[in-house]
Amino acid sequence: MSKLNVNKVVVAYSGGLDTSVIIPWLKENYDCEVVAFVADVGQGEEELVGIEEKAKASGASECYVVDLKEELVADYIYPTLKTGAYYEGKYLLGTSMARPVIAKAQVEIARKVGADALCHGCTGKGNDQVRFEGAFAALAPDLKVIAPWREWDLVSREQCLDYLAERNIPCAASLTKIYSRDANAWHISTEGGVLESTWNAPNEDCWVWTVDPEQAPNEAEYVTLQVEKGEVVAVDGEQMTPYNALVYLNEKGAKHGVGRIDIVENRLVGMKSRGCYETPGGTIMMEALRAVEQLVLDKTSFEFREELGLKASHLVYDGRWFTPLRKSIMAAADELAQDVNGEVVVKLYKGMATVTQKRSENSLYSEAFATFGEDEVYDQSHAGGFIRLYSLSSRIRALNSQK
């Protein structure tokens, strides 16, 4: 395949080995100017220390570090949370939700510097290549896209380190890297190493944020979440921005070992992969939101919201954020959440986040109607006629079968 004619490219840069190699590789193979773009999505301050200097030492002409933490939580995580989306019943979509906000900001930097191409460091086996390039296609169809992992012949960390050493480019990466990790404000994922065999139990070093539930405090801790229109607006009586609320709950949940999952998932590209995911704050938020929904949503609305969550989980996971269907689904979920207002107390103990108290001014739960004791507001004899009509189709089918 012939190479594209490129003048200036913006590369999504992390400071790791792969993207440190990509910058000089782009200059050598495309004879172009390279601008580095770093997305701060809450992966940790330690990951950003000296990153501009690293990028320029690798050959970038400029490096832009963009703070996307609040935007990620407010505009991507919260709308997804309202749908109740779990991918394949367990995964809270941590990596999936971060990719579109990163891609959007990368396109904005490309427009700012007058670039004619975009570059990502995703491998040809994973989901992220589809997520990034799908976003690029929706937001900047005129820009060219370069995916080095689908072009170059570097196949090992040793080769990548040698590549940098030959060019006197400094890199602190080690030859051995046991795990592949991805972190943002919502979660951290761990893949590879011992996890490549499904018969191996995760080692303790497969977990980064959360305490082993067995080693967590013996005394439970309680957190109180205030929910307005399906969003957490305050925790323990203090108003917080979406990002700050998540940081606070991450700290509380991690201390008690909340939010660990070990799953085998179906990747978009067809293969299965295994990962250990930690989402402490997100797990607490989801439990609290679900508790208020149980009070507020009627049966058919709750069922519909469940359907929205299932579809949303696949759209987000599959890299279809910038599509009319994703927007429509989340608009519907947002409408359903207008009355999802309430207060929830969550107990954190030994890996569990358990709702112990919940209330809402919009609650459809009525003690007078739900009581199992003496009943003054509900005439139980009315149920007979309802049941006869409700089961009419079954009755007719049975009568027909007897003919």
Curated annotation (Swiss-Prot):
It is an enzyme of class 6 (ligase). ATP binds at residues 12-20, 39, 121. GO terms for molecular function: argininosuccinate synthase activity; ATP binding. Coiled coil: none annotated. L-aspartate binds at residues 123, 127-128. Pathway: Amino-acid biosynthesis; L-arginine biosynthesis; L-arginine from L-ornithine and carbamoyl phosphate: step 2/3. It comes from the Bacteria. It is found in: Cytoplasm. One of its GO terms (biological process) is urea cycle. L-citrulline binds at residues 91, 96, 127, 131, 180, 189, 265, 277. Keywords: Amino-acid biosynthesis, Arginine biosynthesis, ATP-binding, Cytoplasm, Ligase, Nucleotide-binding. Pfam families: Arginosuc_syn_C, Arginosuc_synth. CDD domains: ASS. It catalyses: L-citrulline + L-aspartate + ATP = 2-(N(omega)-L-arginino)succinate + AMP + diphosphate + H(+). The keyword rRNA processing does not apply. Its EC number is 6.3.4.5. GO terms for cellular component: cytoplasm. Homotetramer. HAMAP family: Arg_succ_synth_type1. Belongs to the argininosuccinate synthase family. Type 1 subfamily. NCBIfam families: argG, PRK00509.1. This is Argininosuccinate synthase. It comes from Vibrio vulnificus (strain YJ016).
